[in-house]
């Protein structure tokens, strides 16, 4: 597992990168081992192999406490359907409870049930593995100064399908249908106060930014290379098609259903909005409405790009749907082309950069 040193904190504008000290080089610092502890139960053991204490941000990692995509599960060479949530987290004003403080050579365990976020009712042999990136801060600090990669062992399990099917799905059941705006597919009965108008504005801005980003992807190869790490024509066309799909979904009735508020208890602290890709549903959280409609800061979060980000998580809009492989400009700018094109934040940051001329 290799560590990638960063020059700036998550979300910081490119112009500031040169003024921020480089992060520590923590080569091979985090080790992750997976072990089966039950029919579909997994225990992840995360070890700090370094010689100094690290603060590890839990968001979208193996340590995430929410029903997120912590591992990849395969059966007979095909990926098992993920039924959990893909959240967008607020990356500013991070608090200590979002981190795991891990001393030198120390370990922490995190257990979760695969059957709560995957359809394992078929039963049989599956293979499970995890890989990703953990944003890191210094001991007792919450400012992101680096990232460390991790890649686990590959675990083989023989699952009892009936026992797995009896496990309650974390995000299972049907969301209340409510009253739906036929033009936007917003569940208007889920909206309070001026939330409906704020969401409609965000969708309109998402469409505008997506169309501009699609145009820039074809006309500005230098900017495209900066974010997507290639100017290959097939990748350009894929990105253009995806931006235009987001634009269409933002302006007319599509296959996603958008809720102004949470109906599934997914809006935990730090979550701006989240998507259930297995259902093509998007839910806003209270913190979403505290964001600006459009941010005037390069790579800053706002309602428009959060909506754009979440729409790329929906397979009805983007196939295969985008994941959360890296957050913020500094991490996004270091993703290889194969991952950049599948990373939701790459699309939202590129759209923001085109809009502001970053």
From Swiss-Prot:
Cofactor: binding comment: Binds 1 zinc ion per subunit.
Enzyme class: hydrolase
Gene3D superfamilies in the record: 2.60.40.2970, Collagenase (Catalytic Domain)
Listed GO biological process terms: proteolysis
EC assignment: 3.4.24.39
Keyword Cytoplasm: no
Protein family (similarity comment): Belongs to the peptidase M35 family.
Protein name per Swiss-Prot or TrEMBL: Neutral protease 2 homolog MGYG_02351
